[in-house]
Curated annotation (Swiss-Prot):
<dbReference type="InterPro" id="IPR050191">
    <property type="entry name" value="ATP-dep_DNA_ligase"/>
</dbReference>
<dbReference type="GO" id="GO:0003677">
    <property type="term" value="F:DNA binding"/>
</dbReference>
<keyword id="KW-0233">DNA recombination</keyword>
<dbReference type="GO" id="GO:0006310">
    <property type="term" value="P:DNA recombination"/>
</dbReference>
<feature type="binding site">
    <location>
        <position position="256"/>
    </location>
    <ligand>
        <name>ATP</name>
    </ligand>
</feature>
<feature type="binding site">
    <location>
        <position position="249"/>
    </location>
    <ligand>
        <name>ATP</name>
    </ligand>
</feature>
<keyword id="KW-0436">Ligase</keyword>
<comment type="similarity">
    <text>Belongs to the ATP-dependent DNA ligase family.</text>
</comment>
<dbReference type="GO" id="GO:0046872">
    <property type="term" value="F:metal ion binding"/>
</dbReference>
<keyword id="KW-0547">Nucleotide-binding</keyword>
<dbReference type="InterPro" id="IPR012310">
    <property type="entry name" value="DNA_ligase_ATP-dep_cent"/>
</dbReference>
<dbReference type="GO" id="GO:0005524">
    <property type="term" value="F:ATP binding"/>
</dbReference>
<dbReference type="GO" id="GO:0071897">
    <property type="term" value="P:DNA biosynthetic process"/>
</dbReference>
<keyword id="KW-0479">Metal-binding</keyword>
<keyword id="KW-0132">Cell division</keyword>
<feature type="binding site">
    <location>
        <position position="424"/>
    </location>
    <ligand>
        <name>ATP</name>
    </ligand>
</feature>
<dbReference type="Pfam" id="PF04679">
    <property type="entry name" value="DNA_ligase_A_C"/>
</dbReference>
Length: 568
């Protein structure tokens, strides 16, 4: 397939805001796509180069892209920067610069194919070591030289930075795959969650139909998105949600880890499907020693502890471990870790996700052999009595944990799904995980830092982010400096002192209450919002929904707050 055909679809998708129209366009396109190119086409349509599970990276930053656009279009870098400030998108800037170039030196090479674009990206990703940055840029310049139109340049650049303005988000793509190949949305979504690969899901749907999708199962060394929990306001609500009886587990203030074991080979993945194996060597050792299964996938919580007291220490210390790929031994001594597996997704060659929790828990306790305190199954209690669950809740909080998880004993494990089969009860007032969508430059002593951050929830109906307020409290100077460096590459536009950013940085925010407000696009505002922590472990898809915001608002209208912070 020619790349210009895909470009034409991108442009058609940009021309409409209707989800139904987008779905129909994509479905028709996928039906005509060659089977061998379908995985790449689907992945490109979502704005990615590689599937979610794939660890490869292009590694070309925005500043390098500005230089590349300047080089290939013979426009000064300052002109490219000014265009970028105006357009807020490097793909659009590339198109604008190529249009100017076309008037002078533009030529017409042969049409490039989707396969050639993909293979060039794969070559860039393979480049590593000394001089790799220059080599990557040279390869990309060669690809851009083959662009036959400014639009093609636009989308090559957009794919390189994985920020395509097509609106073909995962939900739309799942709908389109089902519509194109006669499968239900549930079948497509389940297959997607089990493969972590929409392209592969589409290929199977086209070649094997609904039956092929149903046959897909989880497999070791291919991470899947974790099952997610909803918030509830009390233990009573948790019991009512679970039908009167539930398994309550301690809710640790740690990092979610998905552990894959095949023989002595162990891989550790974050909830964002990032490979953390090299950063956490002691966890690998714990698993090899204590998990008595030849092949297993475990869902777990990794907790940092005080080396003197053995008590849990704040979540941010775990992030120090997760980010560090050098001097691992040094941080290992500074922030020792313990592991609390709480679910099993695969055991001895068989998927366990369709078993009820009560059976999965039994398997977990059989295969995870407690080794002192460093690895043991998460502390759990099965009860129908609110008082007993409350005792465990209080013990959990006194131990330095966040509260409790409540789980339906009959529930299967549903990757990537947030539902009421698993809920969390926390000891503090409500917090929200929100995406930063804009920021403001500071002044005076903080000039050069981004110091105030507009945060937003996700409207699940439209796929858009709706703003809830601006957070400026709770940041140390070090955090502001770090946040500025994180956000700079994500800037998409500037308006005086305000910068718009791609919604990729997630923060946990606490607040006094939610109020109606005409100021923000959501129609609501957080009163006295304050940073709790940066959630590097969360992906943009895990931002709290606007439905969650409205649930909190409605609860706040009906109930008061008890002394321990739980809703009555």
């Amino acid at each position: 397939m020619l790349f210009k055909e895909l470009v034409s679809l991108y442009e058609s998708l940009r021309s409409t805001s209707s989800r139904l129209e987008k779905t129909a366009m994509i479905a028709a396109f996928l039906q005509q796509a060659p089977v061998d190119e379908l995985p790449v086409i689907v992945t490109f349509l979502t704005g990615r180069i590689f599937p979610e599970w794939d660890q490869r990276k292009i590694g070309i930053a925005s500043q390098s892209m500005i230089k590349i656009i300047s080089t290939i279009t013979h426009n000064p870098e300052d002109a490219v920067v000014e265009s970028y400030k105006k357009t807020g998108h490097l793909g659009v800037t590339a198109e604008e610069m190529f249009q100017k170039r076309r008037q002078v030196t533009f030529f017409e090479p042969e049409d490039i194919t989707v396969k050639e674009v993909a293979e060039t990206f794969y070559e860039i990703a393979r480049s590593s070591g000394a001089g790799s940055s220059a080599k990557k840029q040279k390869i990309l310049i060669g690809l851009l030289h083959r662009a036959t139109t400014p639009k093609e340049a636009h989308y090559i650049v957009s794919l390189t930075i994985e920020y395509v303005l097509s609106g073909a988000k995962e939900g739309v793509m799942e709908d389109a795959i089902g519509q194109a190949f006669g499968a239900t949305l549930d079948q497509v979504r389940r297959a997607h969650m089990l493969t972590s690969d929409l392209g592969e899901t589409a290929r199977i749907a086209k070649t094997e139909g609904a039956a092929g999708l149903e046959a897909i199962t989880i497999r070791p060394m291919r991470p899947v998105r974790p099952m997610l929990a909803q918030n509830v306001s009390s233990i009573r609500e948790a019991l009512d949600t679970m039908g009167g009886v539930a398994e309550f587990e301690m809710k640790y203030d740690g990092a979610r880890l998905q552990i894959h074991k095949v023989g002595k080979d162990v891989k550790l993945y974050s909830r964002r499907l990032e490979d953390l194996t090299d950063a956490l060597p002691e966890i690998v050792g714990y698993v090899r020693e204590s998990v008595k299964s030849d092949t297993a996938i475990l869902d777990s919580e990794c907790i940092a502890i005080d080396k003197d007291t053995g008590r849990p220490i704040p979540f941010q210390n775990i992030l120090t471990r997760l980010r560090r790929i050098h001097k691992v031994e040094e941080t290992q001594k500074q922030f020792p870790l313990i592991l609390r597996p709480f679910d099993v997704l695969f055991n001895q060659g068989q998927s366990t996700i369709d078993l009820p929790l009560r059976e999965r828990r039994k398997i977990l306790e059989e295969i995870v052999i407690a080794t002192d305190s460093v690895i043991q199954p998460a502390r759990a209690l099965v009860t129908d009595q609110e008082e007993k669950a409350q005792e465990l809740f209080e013990e959990s909080v006194k131990s330095g944990n966040e509260g409790l998880m409540g789980k339906d004993l009959n529930a299967t494990y549903t990757p990537g799904v947030r539902g009421k089969k698993m809920v969390k009860i926390k000891s503090v007032l409500d917090t929200l995980d929100l995406a930063i969508v804009s920021a403001e430059w500071g002044h005076g002593r903080k000039a050069g830092w981004l110091t105030s951050f507009e945060v937003a929830a996700l409207d699940e109906e439209t796929g858009d982010y709706v703003i809830l307020g601006r957070v400026a409290s709770g940041f140390s100077d070090e955090q502001l400096i770090e946040m500025t460096e994180k956000l700079k590459p994500l800037i998409t536009g500037e308006h005086g002192r305000i910068v718009d950013v791609r919604p990729e940085i997630i923060v946990e925010v606490k607040f006094e209450e939610i109020q109606k407000s005409p100021i923000y696009s959501s129609g609501y505002a957080l009163r006295f919002p304050r940073l709790v922590r940066v959630r590097d472990d969360l992906s943009p898809e895990e931002v709290n929904s606007f439905t969650r915001v409205m649930n909190i608002y409605n609860v706040q209208q009906r109930y008061s707050i008890s002394e321990n912070g739980l809703r009555k």
